[in-house]
Structures are given as structure tokens and as C-alpha cells.
Amino acid sequence: MKYIIRTIAIILIYGGVATIPSKAQIDEIGFGLGGLSYTGDLVRGYKLLQNKPAGTFFIRHNINDHVSLRYAVTGGILSGGDANNPVDPFAVQRNASFRITIVELSIMMEYHFLDFKSGSALTRFSPYFAGGIALFGMSGSNEKPEPYSSFQPAIPLSLGLKYIVNPKWMVGIEFGIRNLFTDWLDNVSEGDPLKKNYQYGNWYDNDTYYFTGFTLNYAFYRIPCPFPYH
């Protein structure tokens, strides 16, 4: 695990510095507001009402009309507990909960399925898919049941939709999942039932967290009006 974290950190730092666009090459800048939620030992599956406040700031370099590179910082709150919606009868007795702050650095490649930026585009919108690598840190007040790193790698995958408002501004909506290599996001993993106050969990099933939000970005270049709007 330490090797994985070190490798992804090197890619994000050195690879990001080497490929991050200069000021003249930054095509778009923007931010997003939304929520973070998670699934793991305390909460199973995505639940919209479990979302806690989150935000993201990003810059984007457009390689061509369909492919872009996005460099982002995302942060927010994650929480969950057995008391809210116990996953099984044993969870009632366990009565575990957590609340942490997440800060994530990511590099993602976006692919837009429709041509909506070129001068010959026939539409103002496009769905898109994004994937890449990320490194996140987590901080909370709960005592760790056993030592584990507060910095972890992740594989972010997202689906979204963008819409061109005018030649300089674009809005979007995105749903993203972070596939993790750790089962300690909720501070619950394996446990020894012979130990007092043990916290059991499924250590064969890693935790996952999600970002759902709306984005607004500004283009330093002029987005051509789609053909029907000329």
C-alpha cells in the first residue's frame, strides 16, 4: 500500500507539474458545489440524503474538441453511522459512527461524446466521461482502532453533462465515484470479537466515496456558437 501511495503521489506531483498547462495554456478555470457521500461498513449503497457539503476548484486544458485534462482540488465532509440506518441487526449493537474532512488532489482526462465546442458544432451540450488518479487526505476526531495512513490513493471515475451558456461561460452537473484501496474511511474494518468494544466490519470490501455537484467554468478562449445559433 505504501508503494501504491508513493507511486500515485509521484505521478500527481511530478507528472502534474510536467504536464500542467502554463498560464497561456490554461483554457478554462472553474469551481463546483455539491456533496460528498460514502458507502462502506456503516452505509451500503449511494444515498442522496447522506450527502454533506463539498466543493471543488479546477483548471482545464483542452487537447482537442473532445478530450480535456482536468486538474482539481476537492474537499468536503464525509459522515455516516449505524444509528441512522443500520445495515443489519448487529449494526444496532455496534453503534459506530464517523465524521471526517476529505481533501483530494486529482488529475483526470475528460472525453466529451458530442462536438459542442467547435465552430461547426450542432449542439450546445455534451455528456462526458472522466477518469484518472487521485490522492486524498482524511482528518477526523475519532481514535484509530489500529494504525493506518491518513493519505490514500483513489481511482476517480465520473459522468457528467456540460452546457455552453455563452461564448465564455459553461455550466455542468457531475456524479463521480472514488474507488479506494482502503477499508478505513469509516474507521471500521476487521475486528476481534474476543476484544472488548471491538468494531467489526468487512475488510474484504474497500470503502468508496462519491462527489455529486454542479459546476461553473470560465473559458479564456472564445467558445464558438454552435452552428444553429450563428
Model regions and ranges:
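Short glycine/proline- and aromatic-enriched beta-strand/turn motifs that initiate or cap beta-hairpins
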Residues: S22-N62, F211-P226
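Repeated loop/turn-to-beta-strand initiation elements of outer-membrane beta-barrel proteins
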Residues: D27, H66-L69, K117, P167-V171, ...
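Residues on the lipid-exposed face of transmembrane beta-strands in outer-membrane beta-barrel proteins
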Residues: F31-L33, F57-H61, I107-Y111, G131-L135, ...
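Outer-membrane beta-barrel proteins
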Residues: Y38-R44, S79-N84, S118, M138-N142, ...
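Extracellular loop and loop/strand-boundary signature of outer-membrane beta-barrel proteins
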Residues: T39-G45, F90-F98, N142-P147, Q199-N202
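Residues that define the transmembrane beta-barrel architecture of outer-membrane proteins
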Residues: L49-P53, T101-L105, F125, P147-I155, ...
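Gram-negative (and chloroplast) outer-membrane scaffold detector with strong preference
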Residues: V67-S141, T212, Y218-F220
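Predominantly the C-terminal beta-signal and adjacent terminal strand-loop region
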Residues: A83, N166-H230
